[in-house]
């Protein structure tokens, strides 16, 4: 004969009396009179264990709004400081600082303008590189490169570096002298840290073994880190009889690296003169 056991009606299935828990909870929610530390008005506060409100509902909400606003202002200030820093590091020359697609010169090649504007508006670090070419001066190559630089910098707020190719080479040469503050690695790291590098007048100087090696290093760094570059040049990509081409100035290796970055994006602006 089997015995059947049943729980007492006043006992929970866990085998214990839970009334002490509800009692503790009710005690934990006791209310007491407090004086608000802000407005000094008396209010009824809920006691939650050792924690008790020090501010009335109105002042507490006011303090919360103040804290949220303080965080928002601090975040905005950080963004402003970052923006100022990347603008200073961009090194856009004064002549080109105000250049943009809205104030561009009349007479620019419509096709080149359209491609440059589309490139700037859709720019990302995954964008291919871009070359503006014309054998003549004054066709708007640097103008469009500056439009791209300013849009990417000020609208997209992406770090860029704008340099004359000759100035970049001179900066690197200066590191060879004793007592310089910067090393060659410092200069190249600046070139690499910019998410967009704009190099103006590439190939303008007569070539040398050092010059070709330096161009190769610059473009190779951009390839390795998959970062785009916008180049202007008055030297053709393909050589013709008796003509100095870009490879003659920067070397076959550097040109190969540049063309790999460009993926065929070479804008020919030959025949224009906006001056």
Task: Give the location of each predicted region.
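A short, basic N-terminal segment
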Residues: 1-111, 266, 275
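Short glycine-rich substrate-engagement loop in P-loop NTPases that contacts/grips substrate
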Residues: 107-114, 135, 139, 149-193, ...
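Pre-Walker A (pre-P-loop) alpha-helix and adjacent loop at the N terminus of AAA/AAA+ ATPase modules
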Residues: 90, 103-131
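Loop/turn-to-beta-strand initiation segments
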Residues: 128, 158-159, 193-196, 225-231
């Amino acid at each position: 004969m089997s015995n059947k056991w049943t729980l007492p009606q006043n006992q929970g299935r866990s085998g214990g009396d839970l009334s002490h828990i509800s009692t503790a909870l009710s005690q934990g929610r006791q209310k007491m009179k407090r004086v608000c530390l802000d407005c000094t008005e008396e209010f009824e506060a809920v006691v939650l264990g050792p924690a008790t409100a020090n501010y009335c509902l109105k002042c507490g909400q006011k303090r919360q709004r103040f804290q949220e606003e303080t965080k928002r202002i601090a975040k905005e200030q950080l963004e402003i400081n970052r923006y100022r820093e990347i603008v200073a590091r961009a090194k856009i020359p004064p002549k080109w600082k105000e250049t943009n697609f809205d104030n561009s010169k009349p007479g620019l090649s419509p096709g080149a303008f359209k491609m440059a504007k589309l490139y700037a508006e859709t720019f990302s670090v995954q964008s291919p590189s871009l070359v503006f070419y014309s054998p003549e001066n004054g066709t708007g190559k640097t103008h469009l490169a500056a439009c791209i630089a300013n849009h990417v910098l000020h609208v997209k707020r992406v770090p860029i570096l704008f340099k004359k190719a000759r100035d970049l080479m001179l900066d690197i040469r200066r590191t060879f002298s004793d007592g310089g503050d910067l090393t060659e690695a410092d200069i190249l790291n600046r070139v690499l840290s910019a998410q967009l590098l704009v190099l103006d007048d590439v190939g303008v100087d007569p070539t040398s073994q050092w010059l070709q090696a330096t161009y190769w290093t610059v473009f190779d760094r951009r390839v390795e880190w998959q970062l785009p570059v916008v180049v202007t040049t008055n030297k053709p990509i393909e050589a013709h009889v008796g003509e100095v081409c870009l490879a003659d100035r920067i070397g076959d290796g550097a040109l190969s690296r540049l063309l790999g970055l460009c993926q065929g994006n070479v804008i020919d602006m030959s025949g224009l003169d906006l001056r």
